[in-house]
Amino acid sequence: MVAVAILAAGKGTRMKSDLPKVLHPLGGRSLVERVIESCALIKPERICTIVGYRAAEVKMALAHLPHLEFVEQTEQLGTGHAVQQLLEPLKDFVGDVVILNGDVPLLRPETIADLVSTHQKNNNDATLLTAQLPNPTGYGRVFCDGDNLVTQIVEHRDCNDAQRKNNRINAGVYCFKWGVLAEALPKLTTNNDQQEYYLTDVILHCDKVMAMDVADFQEISGINDRFQLSAAYEILQDRIKEKWMKAGVMIHQPDTVTIDDTVQLEPDVMIEPQTHLRGNSLIKTGCRLGPGSLIENSVIEANTTILYSVVSDSQVGENAQIGPYTHIRGQAKVGEQCRIGNFVEVKKSTIGNNTNMAHLSYIGDATLGAKVNIGAGTITANYDGVNKHQTVIGDRSKTGANSVLVAPITIGEDVTIAAGSTITKDVDNDCLVVARARQKEIKGWRLQS
């Protein structure tokens, strides 16, 4: 059996934030969520998250994840002290324990699976992940013999000048036989520069300790400040965009595009520069997104084009033309072959197939049928100062420019509303509606001097 322990008790002082460091977002998920997800391939029997700073907030943020256990570390006295908190909850556990840091979010599941496999295949007491860094400053150094068996681990601040020339660093990721670790943890001392309990000192009490180098040292990047968080985001984005381009998605100027790894894309999607895809969005084949668009938590059906527009929490049907400068939001549903154009906002509305609203309109809390044409400047006046009200427009109806529909109101099918009208009453099918003051010409209206 395998258990996982995630160290997530620290404050993260260098983040300059009240938010616990492990809860800072990285591409749509918190740092610690990404660490938890990286354990998927080893299928752990138990996942223990060690919390401390603002523990209740961390627990609440992770409450949606199943089978997660929390262990509190009331004082933060080092990594060894954090793992000592497992002695009671894991007192009856038999198997191996993987130790991960909650602020190292880029580890691939395959890397953790390889670590566990190496550990078990070689019957090690402990196996630690290492990396060869071009600049290892700040990391503990790992010293091994010719068989990758560890002879010594020295924290950076405790290294002498000769030891600091070693580029093999400790990534802070371990797999231990729990029985060996549990026996060694009470023996830790604070005899070091930081006066803390170092988990690495457990190695002194293990007979066989092996190091395994990670293939890509970027995986073990830790997050201690905003600059490192930004750098990790760039690494994550490179991975995501490479994956989708290899799957048949075209991304122009990828350095200007961001895609959350919760987004799903189908082949032959084209993503133009300065476009951002977030949340649980699904983009179907043949769509063109951008330039300059934001899609968030939305479904975009096949062969739809969205230019310089924002779509959030909504659905857009096939072969639609959206933008430029359109805002669709609030669980809106746009049908097939619709055109929604310049400076149009659609909020919490259902738009039927083949409906057009080309410019300068607000459609809120409305249901529009098929083949409706919304003239420039049409407004659904849905708010009375207290409540929102519904507007219904039937199939094939048309609103003239600068029309106002005062909700609640129902406009029937095949209705034409004259330009400049303010409609306050329901309208039957197949009517022409004129609701505006008559034009009047008054000659000689100026006073004679």
UniProtKB/Swiss-Prot annotation:
Keyword Magnesium attributed: yes
GO cellular component: a single term: cytoplasm
Biological role stated in the UniProt entry: Catalyzes the last two sequential reactions in the de novo biosynthetic pathway for UDP-N-acetylglucosamine (UDP-GlcNAc). The C-terminal domain catalyzes the transfer of acetyl group from acetyl coenzyme A to glucosamine-1-phosphate (GlcN-1-P) to produce N-acetylglucosamine-1-phosphate (GlcNAc-1-P), which is converted into UDP-GlcNAc by the transfer of uridine 5-monophosphate (from uridine 5-triphosphate), a reaction catalyzed by the N-terminal domain.
Enzyme Commission no: 2.7.7.23, 2.3.1.157
Binding locations of Mg(2+): D103, N224
NCBIfam families linked to this entry: glmU, PRK14360.1
Domain of life of the source: Bacteria
Protein name: Bifunctional protein GlmU
Stretch forming the signal peptide: none
Any Gene Ontology biological process: lipid A biosynthetic process
Active site: H359
Molecular function GO labels: glucosamine-1-phosphate N-acetyltransferase activity; magnesium ion binding; structural constituent of carboxysome shell; UDP-N-acetylglucosamine diphosphorylase activity
Cofactor note as given: Binds 1 Mg(2+) ion per subunit.
